[in-house]
């Protein structure tokens, strides 16, 4: 838990992001120089940490605060055939070396690690929250773009490069210039069947993949306040897809209830002190944002992507756009390129697009609520002929929770594959990949060319749309069943 610094009693009206930043400035930059910001927690995985550990080793430096680092194995781990967590269960030699190196580095430098075979293992952005390591008011970094997910707790969380990972290891600080602030005001309430994934995809389509560049986004409004923590994590997770540095949601009782009692959460009097501080974090009435964007949540329907970046999205009820629908020359050219790669014909109803693989997984949408939503839709159904559906929980803990609820049986009875935890098909760095020309409906966060395997074509969807699509064989919502 981060304690407020002396100047936190200022009467200046501040946003949530500005308060967290203020309370972490070790030294303020002068004449345009960056501030030196204290980092409360650094999360590590097997892909972006080896070079940083090597840097410490080569310079003879120690890890300044091992207790403020937390590691797990996620990006390259297989999601089938894992029984003991042995390195021998990883067939790919490069992946095996990366996982082995992480284990060796964590042992040498005293970092807490949750490896394959550990019930607490999983995708790093699920592990932090489930352990209670992620808390309101923190600064959190990781060598991974989707660190922004932790902002759902009212923390300022963002991805960093490997050289910065090493800098945090050595100093527990980062030199940074303050980010601009943007309020995303969601008016109205989401309709039944519309999820936080639909909302964030609609936001990205509205402001564009560069619309949030240089900003911290704060998601606000009644629809946000009514969301569970799982849903809020989905929102903040995809802030980076709008170009933002981070995404945040003000902590409230929903946040406190989620964190309380978890292994690394404060206890007793420390808990009371923490909550008292956390309650001071929400944006002050009258605080000014650098930019405000409004979106009518009540008007939203299930939303998907049709192209090759997360901003190329439309309501599921619409049709594949034509490049001529775009007035901006860059958007027109991007649409032409995307349509060619995705092998789509303008005017085709999105609901007519045939899907080969449904992937229910990733740090965006593979928590227990996501699995429950999909299982409720799949119950009593079979997936379409020729369809492959992979269900990959985002942590072993969630996998066991789902199995205790019988969700695994619902998935397997429907014909889906029930896998072990990992990043899986979100990215083509492990055995779970699309074949060239295959098309997926994926609950992950990126639909770039080749993201899920060379030549693979990705449509980003919500868990509900994923489940309905698996049943019908074409992009579908539960209303189509």
UniProtKB/Swiss-Prot annotation:
Domain of life: Bacteria
GO BP term, example: L-leucine biosynthetic process
Keyword match Nuclease: no
Keyword Transcription regulation belongs to the record: no
GO molecular function term, any single one: 3-isopropylmalate dehydratase activity
Ligand binding ([4Fe-4S] cluster): 363, 423, 426
Pathways involved: Amino-acid biosynthesis; L-leucine biosynthesis; L-leucine from 3-methyl-2-oxobutanoate: step 2/4
Record note on cofactor: Binds 1 [4Fe-4S] cluster per subunit.
EC number: 4.2.1.33
Sequence segments annotated as region (Disordered): 432-459
Cofactors, names only: [4Fe-4S] cluster
Record Gene3D superfamilies: Aconitase, domain 3 (3.30.499.10)
Cross-referenced InterPro entries: 3-IsopropMal_deHydase_lsu, Acnase/IPM_dHydase_lsu_aba_1/3, Acoase/IPM_deHydtase_lsu_aba, Aconitase_4Fe-4S_BS, Aconitase_4Fe-4S_dom, IPM_dehydratase_rel_enz, IPMI_cat
Catalytic reaction(s) noted: (2R,3S)-3-isopropylmalate = (2S)-2-isopropylmalate
Keyword list, A-Z: 4Fe-4S, Amino-acid biosynthesis, Branched-chain amino acid biosynthesis, Iron, Iron-sulfur, Leucine biosynthesis, Lyase, Metal-binding
Enzyme class: lyase
Function (record text): Catalyzes the isomerization between 2-isopropylmalate and 3-isopropylmalate, via the formation of 2-isopropylmaleate.
Family: Belongs to the aconitase/IPM isomerase family. LeuC type 1 subfamily.
Subunit record text: Heterodimer of LeuC and LeuD.
NCBIfam families membership: leuC, PRK05478.1, PRK12466.1
Protein name: 3-isopropylmalate dehydratase large subunit
Native species: Corynebacterium glutamicum (strain R)
Lineage: Bacteria, Bacillati, Actinomycetota, Actinomycetes, Mycobacteriales
